[in-house]
């Protein structure tokens, strides 16, 4: 009897040498929390409709696509660099570190990695940087969604621990409300103390 593989099984029969991964990050600009990166290898046999730059999608749509990407992609990995690593390395190097971790965490090794932006992490395979890649390459769009949703969920969790800052609302960005909370309450352990607005609050708090 001839065994016909399922779509998922058939996908895994592809030549690994032809696999392409998309990589993007979330959380470079905020004043608090880790920077998150995701790497995704999509399955051409299971297309995902509606992939786009995560920034133009509603939160509800991102959540829907997050689950679909996780279910349909050949493989994906979400990684991060901590606040401590951001402080030690700087935000650019920490972002590249998170990207490298995401690629290295993929179950399948891609032949080519397409990265959103104009800088590349150090990788063992060929890689290309694509400016505005999250709007141009489906795999990068998928990575941007995974990274964004993962970080937004982190913000919701830390908001419970530090409700006075409103992380669930502003996602750590330097909004008027966030800066006011920083001035009133000072910085919490999740704040990036080398970032200008946070450093300024800490300086003003010195006796």
Curated annotation (Swiss-Prot):
Span of domain RNase H type-2: 18-207
Principal subcellular localisation of the protein: cytoplasm
TM spans (from-to): none
Top-level class of the enzyme under EC nomenclature: hydrolase
Molecular function via GO: manganese ion binding; RNA binding; RNA-DNA hybrid ribonuclease activity
Cofactor note: Manganese or magnesium. Binds 1 divalent metal ion per monomer in the absence of substrate. May bind a second metal ion after substrate binding.
Subcellular location(s) per record: Cytoplasm
InterPro entries: RNase_HII, RNase_HII/HIII, RNase_HII/HIII_dom, RNaseH-like_sf, RNaseH_sf
The EC number(s) this enzyme carries: 3.1.26.4
An example Gene Ontology CC term for this record: ribonuclease H2 complex
Signal peptide: none
Co-factor(s): Mn(2+); Mg(2+)
Keywords: Cytoplasm, Endonuclease, Hydrolase, Manganese, Metal-binding, Nuclease
GO-annotated biological processes: DNA replication, removal of RNA primer; mismatch repair
Substrates-to-products reaction catalysed: Endonucleolytic cleavage to 5'-phosphomonoester
Pfam families to which the protein is assigned, alphabetical: RNase_HII
Chain positions recorded as a divalent metal cation binding sites: 24-25, 116
Membership in a protein family: Belongs to the RNase HII family.
Function noted in UniProt: Endonuclease that specifically degrades the RNA of RNA-DNA hybrids.
Protein name: Ribonuclease HII
Species: Albidiferax ferrireducens (strain ATCC BAA-621 / DSM 15236 / T118) (Rhodoferax ferrireducens)
Chain's gene name: rnhB
């Amino acid at each position: 009897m001839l065994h016909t593989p399922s779509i998922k099984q058939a996908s895994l029969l592809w030549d690994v040498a032809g696999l392409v991964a998309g990589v993007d990050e979330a959380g470079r600009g905020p004043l608090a929390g880790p920077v998150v990166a995701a790497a995704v290898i999509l399955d051409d046999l299971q297309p995902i409709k509606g992939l786009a730059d995560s920034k133009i999608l509603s939160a509800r749509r991102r959540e829907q696509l997050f689950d679909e990407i996780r279910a349909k992609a050949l493989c994906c990995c979400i990684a991060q660099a901590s606040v401590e690593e951001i402080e030690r390395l700087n935000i650019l190097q920490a972002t590249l570190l998170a990207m490298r971790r995401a690629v290295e965490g993929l179950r399948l090794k891609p032949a080519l990695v397409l990265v959103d932006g104009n800088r590349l992490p150090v990788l063992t395979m060929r890689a290309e940087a694509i400016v505005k890649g999250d709007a141009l390459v489906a795999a990068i769009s998928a990575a941007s969604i995974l990274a964004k949703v993962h970080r937004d969920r982190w913000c919701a969790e830390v908001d419970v621990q530090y409700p006075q800052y409103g992380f669930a609302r502003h996602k750590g960005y330097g909004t008027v409300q966030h800066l006011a909370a920083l001035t009133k309450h000072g910085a919490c352990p999740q704040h990036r103390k080398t970032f200008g607005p946070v450093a300024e609050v800490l300086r003003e708090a010195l006796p």
